[in-house]
Every structure is written in structure tokens, then in C-alpha cells.
């Protein structure tokens, strides 16, 4: 699996498309509602290309639910990076 991460509008999807295969984009949105992040990471690792937007930089949200969602997204990204054959960070 190729894992591509980076900020919004950094060209992740454009970079990913030529690789073909099964692709899933913006997986950070799945993390907040996941019962088990390791199980979700295992499921997503079955794709050929996975992209996630980095949400951990910048202003920390006041809302606890938004902070928890960002934390979950970051932990999911770490799990995906550990399972990936290759990780690409876009800037």
C-alpha cells in the first residue's frame, strides 16, 4: 500500500491517480467514528493507495470533539504509515 499524506490542496489525489489500483481518499474523516483504529487501519491497508489530509498542524480546536477527531486522525495516519510499503508526504 502507498500512503500519501499532506495538507489540503497539496496535490495528493493528482499524485495518486497514475498509480492506479484501488484507491481511497481523505481517510482521516473515518477516524473520528471508528470503534477500533487498528482494525480500520487493517481494512484500509487492503487498498493500493490511501490518502489522508494532515489535520494536526495549526490552531487547536476549542471543541473537545474536534480535538478528539484530530487526535484520532493523527493516530490513524501513524498506523497506516506503519503498514505502508511506501509513505509520501506532500507539501
Predicted regions and their residues:
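Glycine-rich P-loop/Walker A and Walker A-like loops and their local beta1-loop-alpha1 context
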Residues: 1-21, 25
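Conserved inter-motif catalytic segment of the P-loop NTP-binding fold
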Residues: 18, 23-47, 55
Amino acid at each position: 500500500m502507498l500512503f500519501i499524506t499532506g495538507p489540503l490542496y497539496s496535490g495528493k489525489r493528482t499524485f495518486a491517480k497514475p498509480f492506479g489500483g484501488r484507491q481511497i481518499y481523505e481517510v482521516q474523516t473515518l477516524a473520528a467514528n471508528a470503534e477500533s483504529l487498528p482494525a480500520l487501519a487493517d481494512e484500509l491497508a487492503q487498498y493500493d493507495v490511501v490518502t489522508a489530509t494532515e489535520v494536526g498542524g495549526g490552531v487547536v480546536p476549542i471543541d473537545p470533539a474536534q480535538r478528539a477527531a484530530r487526535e484520532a486522525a493523527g493516530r490513524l495516519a501513524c498506523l497506516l504509515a506503519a503498514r505502508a510499503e511506501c509513505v509520501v508526504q506532500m507539501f
